[in-house]
UniProtKB/Swiss-Prot annotation:
Record's subunit section: Part of the 50S ribosomal subunit.
Keyword set, alphabetical order: Ribonucleoprotein, Ribosomal protein
An MF annotation (GO) of this entry: structural constituent of ribosome
Protein name, UniProt field: Large ribosomal subunit protein uL30
Length: 59
């Protein structure tokens, strides 16, 4: 079974770069406090790295 990680949005996307907003939507995050569980892949890690200042990650 693939390893999964939990990603939670902790800061607002208002006033952020359009690319960063699109990345949050790509992660499946819609609002502050929203948590999603995703398969841990290099592509996902790259997305998280881009918006690391707006999300919290749990292994």
């Amino acid at each position: 079974m693939a390893k999964t990680i939990k990603v939670t949005q902790v800061r607002s996307s208002i006033g952020r770069l359009p690319k960063h907003k699109a990345t949050l939507l790509g992660l499946g995050l819609r609002r502050i406090g929203h948590t999603v569980e995703r398969e841990d892949t290099p592509a996902l890690r790259g997305m998280i790295n881009l918006v690391s200042y707006m999300v919290k990650v749990e292994e």
